[in-house]
């Protein structure tokens, strides 16, 4: 990692976008647990960073600070951020930084008996599970464990590239207005 990105040593802290925005508002530098879980840098149970992975990849451990929980207070709005709006000191509640988990929290009736599909930059198919699923089958079939709100977990299968396919379809339909996915799949075969 360091050979490819020597500037990583100059960094003070790694913050995904949702955590960076919270830092700019509160001054608290932490990474929210649901977004951390999809980086593949947490222990399988999603409770802490996997420092063994950092060491093997040559990633400085100092970049990865505390984890925060969604739905819990994580600092207050700073005076400098409030800048005269009269909201300095108002508590900030962390949200699920991973967009799929935020969407799942709004899905009515989602429990361990139902599956979900999330469409965004990728296509995610999954189900709530009691604990992370760690076995040869899930690894072989490329399933991932996603940490959720309140200690929940989802076993998910990612189908990346949905956004790319949509952009391609947009361009192709300029030339062939009625182009559909079936025709694209047939041409790909």
Predicted regions mapped to residue ranges:
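Buried hydrophobic packing segments
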Residues: 1, 25, 41, 103-107, ...
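Gly/Ser/Thr-rich active-site cleft segment
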Residues: 1-98
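A short helix-loop
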Residues: 2-5, 10, 27-28, 54-56, ...
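Short coil/turn connectors at secondary-structure junctions
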Residues: 9-12, 36, 62-63, 87-90, ...
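Short alpha-helical "patches" and their helix-cap loops
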Residues: 11-13, 32-42, 116-122, 176-188
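Short glycine-aspartate micro-motif
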Residues: 14, 92-100, 104, 114-118, ...
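Short acidic, glycine/serine/threonine-rich loops at helix termini
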Residues: 25-30, 77-80, 105-109, 127-132, ...
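Conserved A3 ("GATE") glycine/threonine-rich loop of ANL adenylate-forming enzymes
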Residues: 37-39, 98-102, 119-124, 144-152, ...
